């Protein structure tokens, strides 16, 4: 039986405030570790080389969202690791995603992994992470580099292979102490988080409704815990024009790229920093040859917003922009044709009293264990924790690696963060599972 150590809580306001005023969140000033918790920390210290080697093996399996084979390989590895700890594992499939673009077609989604321990413990805990990264198979950034000063550089080291390795090894530390016996715990690894969890959202919501608390092992930066997040949306535009020789028959063409240029200018005007709304045309393509009037153009757009109403307003604005054609050619009155697709894929993650309690405990424990969490932040980035909390599951995210440079070849973290966060995760999981 796991015994909770006595805790004396004295509520104080945070001295560090990041990206907005924070009030009413208490910090546990006094904490002590139980004998079992100390033994878990010792286990992590003893297995540092093993944990680092596992991180390298995880990072060097390419799991770009479109690399189904790589994701299948990684899922099988995770399934084996969890089965060794006594979990029952099951895969869940998603329908392919239709892509509105000049090339068209569908994006195949790799199967997701759900692992469960079904005991009689009262508190039902859901922990989750995503297997996919933004790095494709042909990206040059494919390996983990361990530098002499302990800096780790590699694809997904912070987002979020590091978080997964932390999670697995924290569970291993609990397993050695017998602290996974008779618990109610579900682990979810999805394969499409980097494209908005479009295929896995229903599964995430269903599982969230069956649990009492959620923990997400996404990374963070500057040792800050994420208290609230913006909502996220995405949109696609496709313009169909008419190809023609740009020299001999320019007048017979209808430029899809010209029409799209007008669209992008209007879309970018939707950014309003004062309202905390941003819009970014992240991917833009048009035409195939220099000497041909482009017959097709497409754009892939990102939206960030502070409220559901603001997100819905963005959706409507993009649809209105798509409905107004600017380029004209009297010979072809039905062209250009503009199509749009929008989705609000991440709800706003608001402050939550239960989550604040978990953050306060995490801050106190981290100060005791090492690499303390020094404050909180409001983030414009998204996680699946936004989805779980939107359906009623209090969810703390940002329990993974402290790092920087995510989604770029500069992505990095540290060995210190890997080990310290594994210790913190082990203690926090033990306490949540045995409440």
Regions found by a protein language model. Name each.
Residues 1-12:
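Bacterial N-terminal signal peptides that target proteins for export
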Residues 132-148, 228-238, 364, 401:
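Acidic-glycine-rich active-site phosphate/pyrophosphate-binding loop
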Residues 24-28:
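Sec/Tat signal peptide C-region and signal peptidase I cleavage site
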Residues 149-159, 373-376, 408-409:
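Short pre-catalytic strand/loop immediately N-terminal to key active-site residues, enriched for Gly-Thr
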Residues 10-21:
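Bacterial N-terminal signal peptides
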Residues 29-39, 63, 81-84, 236-435:
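Metal-dependent amide/peptide-bond hydrolase catalytic core
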Residues 160-234, 272, 433-434:
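Acidic/histidine-rich catalytic neighborhood of metal-dependent amide-processing enzymes
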Residues 30-152, 176, 385:
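Acidic/His- and Gly-rich active-site-bordering loop/insert found
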